[in-house]
Amino acid sequence: MTAVKARAYWQLMRMDRPIGSLLLLWPTLWALLLAAQGLPDLRVLVVFVLGVFLMRSAGCVINDYADRHVDGHVKRTSQRPLPAGLVSAKEALLLFVLLAVSSFLLVLTMNTLTIQLSFIGILLAFVYPFMKRFTHLPQLVLGLAFSWSIPMAWAAQANTLTPQVWVLFLINALWTIAYDTQYAMVDRDDDVKIGIKSTAILFGRWDKRIIGLLQLATLSLLVALGQGLALGTSYYWGLLIAAGLFAYQQHLIRYRERMPCFQAFLNNNYVGMAITAGILLSVW
């Protein structure tokens, strides 16, 4: 394999841009920490951290495969490996299978409940990239896909699923819809031209308000979750920081400009980090 080909595979998996993996990692850590009520089992932690990066990479590959005929028409994606001809469609599919199988082999080291839940996760990861052709709500499907690590991680740590799991699932789904709508705002003009659907297009002039409502709902449910689990003061400091970051994101997207909207999307990494730190300090 040449250096150019290796670099193309690396870029296809977004290993050069790990923001997506980090946004998937934070809620996974929330679930592990809360299920353990402290530090999770080291083996489970290692499996899920590796699994997050493998499945996020698999999701990026199948997403680019699904979009291979349209990415060349979008300014932000025109130089990705598939539209640039650096990786073939067949090679991308083979890479997706390799990554998905590797993730599944990791899951096989977990308990039966986690293994059963993983089949839904794989299905969501495969289906999501194709949704933008059929519905204006692909961000909702992404929210489900990015949140499915929560019941899986909880099941792996506790071997059961409690009602709090599904509250956390809903919290992350709402947050995901909010930040992926910010991401979709970057490409909205191009997407309208080529017929790609998104919540950014669906929400139209209400986009900023709806993102704000989703962020408010996320924080409100996080407060309710903290009260239900009797989490400590550190948790609420984490939520306060997250609230400040959400306010900053609203400032960034106020004019709907491409780069500030993208910066708002990236800023969500710090939201996830703040909440994770709050949970960790509260349960440790």
UniProtKB/Swiss-Prot annotation:
Name of one Pfam family that matches: UbiA
Keyword set, alphabetical order: Cell inner membrane, Cell membrane, Magnesium, Membrane, Transferase, Transmembrane, Transmembrane helix, Ubiquinone biosynthesis
Needed cofactors: Mg(2+)
Membrane-spanning intervals of the chain: 19-39, 42-62, 93-113, 114-134, 136-156, 158-178, 210-230, 233-253, 264-284
Subcellular location: Cell inner membrane
EC number: 2.5.1.39
Record-level GO cellular component terms: plasma membrane
Catalysed conversion reaction: all-trans-octaprenyl diphosphate + 4-hydroxybenzoate = 4-hydroxy-3-(all-trans-octaprenyl)benzoate + diphosphate
GO molecular function terms attached to this record: 4-hydroxybenzoate polyprenyltransferase activity
This protein's pathway: Cofactor biosynthesis; ubiquinone biosynthesis
Topological category with respect to the lipid bilayer: Multi-pass membrane protein
Nucleotide-binding found in the keyword field: no
GO biological process: ubiquinone biosynthetic process
Cell inner membrane among keywords: yes
Protein family membership: Belongs to the UbiA prenyltransferase family.
HAMAP family per record: UbiA
Function: Catalyzes the prenylation of para-hydroxybenzoate (PHB) with an all-trans polyprenyl group. Mediates the second step in the final reaction sequence of ubiquinone-8 (UQ-8) biosynthesis, which is the condensation of the polyisoprenoid side chain with PHB, generating the first membrane-bound Q intermediate 3-octaprenyl-4-hydroxybenzoate.
Protein name: 4-hydroxybenzoate octaprenyltransferase
Organism from which the protein derives: Vibrio cholerae serotype O1 (strain ATCC 39315 / El Tor Inaba N16961)
Gene: ubiA
